[in-house]
Design a protein with these regions (language model features):
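Internal glycine-rich, Lys/Arg-flanked active-site/core loops of soluble domains
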Residues: 1-152
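Short, ordered beta-strand-loop transition motifs
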Residues: 79-80, 175-180
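Short glycine-/polar-rich loops that comprise or flank the Walker A/P-loop
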Residues: 133, 167-168
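A structural detector for beta-sheet-dominated domains
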Residues: 138-141, 165, 187
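Flexible, small-/acidic-enriched active-site or ligand-binding loops
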Residues: 143-167
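Short solvent-exposed strand/turn elements
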Residues: 179-197
Length: 197
C-alpha cells in the first residue's frame, strides 16, 4: 500500500473519487519498484517502444493508466504557472546523440511517444544524467496544455517534476559538449494530439 500526497480537489468536477484515482495514478507513476507499485516503466516502454505512437488496446490496463495520466495533466495544467523551461537527465548510453545532430542539421522535428518526466530544477535532472550523461534543456510554450507540475503528487516532491504528455514534438536547436555531460537543446512545438484519450 502507498500513501497519496495532495488532492486534485476542485479540479475534479465529478467528485472526490476521480480526484483520488488521479492522485493515485500520479503517485504510482512517480513511484519506484515493481509493477504493483510503479507503472512508469510499463506505460512508457509500451507507448514508446511497442506502440510507437499507436493507441493502447481498449479496456486494457495500459489504456486506463494512459487515460488517467492524460486527464491528470490536463486538470493540473496551469498557464499561469509560467513553466517555460524544463530539464531531463538521461544516462549517456541511452541517448543516440547522432540522431539529434542529424535532426538539427536537417531541421526535422523529433517526437517523443511516451510520457516524459522532466524537472524545473536543472540540478535534479543532472543527477539523473550522471557523469557523461545527457541533459535535455526544453523550452516550452506555457500556454500549451501538454505539461503539468506534478511534484505535489509525487513520491519524490523535491525533484520538482513536470510531466509531459506523449506525442510531444520538438525542434532540435543544439547539441553541445559541456565537459561532464552533453546538452541537447529542444524547443517544444505546440500541437494537440488528436488521438489521445
Amino acid at each position: 500500500m502507498y500513501l497519496v500526497r495532495g488532492s486534485l480537489g476542485g479540479a475534479a468536477r465529478d467528485g472526490e473519487m476521480r480526484s483520488r484515482v488521479l492522485c493515485d495514478v500520479l503517485y504510482k507513476y512517480t513511484a519506484e519498484g515493481d509493477r504493483r507499485k510503479s507503472i512508469y516503466k510499463h506505460v512508457n516502454n509500451t507507448l514508446g517502444k511497442l506502440l510507437k505512437g499507436a493507441q493502447p488496446k481498449r479496456r486494457s490496463g495500459l489504456e486506463f493508466y494512459t487515460q488517467k495520466l492524460v486527464m491528470a495533466v490536463r486538470l493540473l495544467f496551469d498557464s499561469n504557472a509560467g513553466i517555460r523551461k524544463v530539464y531531463r537527465g538521461v544516462r549517456g548510453e541511452l541517448v543516440d546523440l547522432e540522431f539529434y545532430r542529424e535532426k538539427q542539421q536537417s531541421r526535422e522535428q523529433v517526437q517523443w511517444n511516451s510520457f516524459t518526466s522532466t524537472s524545473m530544477a536543472r540540478d535534479a535532472a543532472l543527477n539523473f544524467a550522471g557523469g557523461g550523461g545527457v541533459l535535455f534543456v526544453i523550452t516550452r510554450d506555457p500556454e500549451h496544455a501538454a505539461a503539468a507540475d506534478i511534484h505535489e503528487y509525487s513520491q519524490f516532491p523535491n525533484e520538482q517534476e513536470v510531466l509531459l504528455l506523449p506525442m510531444q514534438v520538438f525542434d532540435v536547436q543544439g547539441v553541445h559538449d559541456r565537459g561532464g555531460h552533453t546538452e541537447i537543446v529542444l524547443r517544444e512545438v505546440p500541437h494537440y494530439p488528436a488521438e489521445l484519450p
